[in-house]
Amino acid sequence: MLSNPEIINALSQLGLTNYESKVYLSLVSEGICTAKDISNICGIPYGKVYEVINSLAAKGFINVLPTKPMKYKAIHPKELIK
């Protein structure tokens, strides 16, 4: 997982929390993941992951894929800049 402090800082300037930044970066680097995958990759408690995912989706940073189990995909960083 990417954990570059400069990237985390840049994402915080865009309004993301530390957990949101970690989840977004993990999805950018890993691709499509389940909540369990995200929890394992980021070290964020599984119960907290859903709160973070919902927040990122509301802010337009990720897409929620209607699969079983639900999967999540980051919006490409270039798309966010537009």
Mark where each language-model region is.
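Amphipathic alpha-helical scaffolds
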Residues: 43, 49-52
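Short acidic alpha-helix initiation/capping motifs at coil-to-helix transition points
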Residues: 1-3
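Key DNA-contact positions within bacterial/archaeal DNA-binding proteins
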Residues: 21, 36, 47
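Short capping segments at the starts of secondary-structure elements
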Residues: 28-34
